[in-house]
Amino acid sequence: MIMDELWQTLRASELLVHQIDALTRLNRQKGLGQILITHTMKDLTLSTEQLSEIARGFLERSSVKYFGGLARNEMELLEQVLPLSQREKDLLVEWSAEGATDPRTGQSLPPPGRGRFMMKLGENAPGVPFKMNLTDTEHRIHDTNEAWVEAMARARA
């Protein structure tokens, strides 16, 4: 079971946190594997501390975790559920920077963290950074910036 954009589910009704919690606890009994995907730890901060604790438990109970770039102010929230070394935190923050503009061509450069992730197994093992390299076909299928690129091209014309 894959729950991408988990923040949307939690915003639809924070009480769904109880259903998701049950799934994370009973998934093996049901013969399910699961992947929960969201953007930031702030997505797991709900209207009450009790609901927020339940949501943070999703991460606490995950034996394998993948992180992309995160803002520096996310580190404190993340460390409430997972210890990170200073190097791991610095790397995640570095990856969150926006892309620059090439001064010679005026072209936008990709952000430094595009396709970069860190895998954490358990709590004490060091994070393993890696880069995803998409094929041309995968890039076309998963390009979420297409509308933005087209709008920028129209603006330049």
Question: What spans do the regions from the language model cover?
Answer:
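Conserved P-loop NTPase motor module
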Residues: A100-A157
